Amino acid sequence: MAGAKEIRSKIASVQNTQKITKAMEMVAASKMRKSQDRMAASRPYAETMRKVIGHLANGNLEYKHPYLEERDVKRVGYLVVSTDRGLCGGLNINLFKKLLAEMKAWSDKGVQCELAMIGSKGVSFFNSVGGNVVAQVTGMGDNPSLSELIGPVKVMLQAYDEGRLDKLYIVSNKFINTMSQVPTITQLLPLPASEDDDLKRKAWDYLYEPDPKALLDTLLRRYVESQVYQGVVENLASEQAARMVAMKAATDNGGSLIKELQLVYNKARQASITQELTEIVSGAAAV
C-alpha cells in the first residue's frame, strides 16, 4: 500500500491548498466590493473633469496653455499602473503586452519612451526587460491616496513642462465587471480634443478671473491627477476581481484533482486487496 499512502498524502496536500485558495477568494471578494465603492465614488469627479477639459480642448481660448498644444513627438512618457501583489491571473501581463506593443511602434518611428511605475509588479517587469523607468511608487495597499501618487505624476509633468516629453499617457486596467477587465492606454497630454458630438455642438466660451494662466495651470494639473487616481482605483478593483476569479478557478481545479486522485487511490486500494485475497487463496490451495 505504499502507492496508496503516497496518493493519500497528495490528496491531503491538495485539500490544504484548496482551503487556502478558497479563503483568498473570499478575501478578494470582500476587498473587491470596497474597491468598487471607492471607484464609484471617484468616477463622477473624474468624468466631470474630463468633460470640462474636453470643452477647453475644443474651445477657442484667449490663452493657449502648453498642455493644449501638439508637439513634434520625439519622446513619450507612460504612467503605468500595475499591482503590488500577484495571483491575479493575466491582469498584469496582458497590460504589459499591450504597452510593449505600443512602445515598439514608437521605437520603430525613432521615438524614445520613459516610464513612471505605480505598483511593484510593473517595476520588476520593466527593470527585467530593460525599460527606462524614471520614477516609481510601490506598496500603496488597498486604499491608495492621491498624495502617494504625486511623486511619479510630478516627475512626468516636470519632464513635459521642460520639453523632455512630448506626449504623456496613463496605462491601466479598466474595470468593466467582475469577469472583464480591459487594459487601456489613454492620452493625458497634450489634451486630446473630445470626440463627443454633444460637446462639439455646445462649445463653451470662458472668461478668466483674474488670470487664465494661473487658473489653467491649476485646473490642468488637477485633471491629470484625477485621471491618474481614477486609473489606480479602477486597476485596484480589477486586481481584486481578477484575483477572486483566479482563486475560484484554482479551488475548482483542486476539487477536480481531488476527485481524480480519489479514483486512483480507490483503484490502488482495490488492487492491493485483490492481491492479498489471491495470496490467501493460493496459500490455502497449497495446504
From Swiss-Prot:
Gene3D superfamilies: 3.40.1380.10, ATP synthase, gamma subunit, helix hairpin domain. One of its GO terms (cellular component) is proton-transporting ATP synthase complex. GO terms for molecular function: ATP binding; proton-transporting ATP synthase activity, rotational mechanism. It comes from the Bacteria. It is a peripheral membrane protein. InterPro entries: ATP_synth_F1_ATPase_gsu, ATP_synth_F1_gsu, ATP_synth_F1_gsu_CS. Keywords: ATP synthesis, Cell inner membrane, Cell membrane, CF(1), Hydrogen ion transport, Ion transport, Membrane, Transport. One of its GO terms (biological process) is proton motive force-driven plasma membrane ATP synthesis. It holds the Pfam family ATP-synt. Produces ATP from ADP in the presence of a proton gradient across the membrane. The gamma chain is believed to be important in regulating ATPase activity and the flow of protons through the CF(0) complex. F-type ATPases have 2 components, CF(1) - the catalytic core - and CF(0) - the membrane proton channel. CF(1) has five subunits: alpha(3), beta(3), gamma(1), delta(1), epsilon(1). CF(0) has three main subunits: a, b and c. Belongs to the ATPase gamma chain family. NCBIfam families: ATPsyn_F1gamma, PRK05621.1-1. This is ATP synthase gamma chain. The gene is atpG.
